[in-house]
Amino acid sequence: CIRDRKYAFRKYKIKSVENNHTHLSPEELGKIESLELGGRFTKLEKTKDAFLFCCYAGLRYSDFTNLSPENIVKMHQETWLIYKSVKTNTEVRLPLYLLFEGKGIEVLNKYQDDLADFFKLRDNSNVNKELLIIAKLSGLNKRISFHTARHTNATLLIYSGVNITTVQ
């Protein structure tokens, strides 16, 4: 084929996949924040709170589920999240008290009696299914996943004037 200058794969087309990185606007995030989950949806509360915490902190699912109470550190009366990233194996230090008016700290305080349990979630696939229900109950017409939290964090930080190289 090469000698004859014929391209053996000329009939094949490479399919491109649309990049579906979704983020939430401040208004959409507010809808999830204000969602009251009662009755048969009470079991979704922890998933909602974990998602919101990751919106405020920018964590991946794998990093969140690998956290322990020891990763929440008080330094000079301020709350920090210090952990080693599962994907990159690098240490990350996040000043939770500076991010989004300390909303992440509020979530952690809600679970202060059993933070270890808060960091334990179902598998990512089931959590993502629960997030679809949460989005629908919030009135969002958007397919969100746990990774949406990370994109939401980055987008909101950039909107608020944080340098993109800092966000990366």
Q: What kind of region is each of these model predictions?
A:
Residues 38-41, 112-117, 121, 129-166:
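Short, basic (Lys/Arg/His-rich) helix/loop patches that form interaction surfaces
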Residues 6-61:
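Basic, Lys/Arg- and aromatic-enriched nucleic-acid-binding interface segment
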Residues 47, 77, 90, 140, ...:
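Exposed loop/turn and edge beta-strand positions of beta-sandwich/beta-sheet ligand-binding modules
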Residues 79-81:
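Short aromatic-glycine-enriched beta-strand elements
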Residues 33, 51-54, 65, 132-135, ...:
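Generic hydrophobic alpha-helical scaffold/packing signal
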Residues 18-19, 86-133:
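C-terminal catalytic core of Y-nucleophile DNA break-rejoin enzymes
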Residues 3-5, 28, 54-77, 165:
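Short, charged phosphate-coordinating catalytic segments
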Residues 59-60, 92, 150:
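Short, cationic motifs built from Arg/Lys/His that form the positively charged side of catalytic pockets
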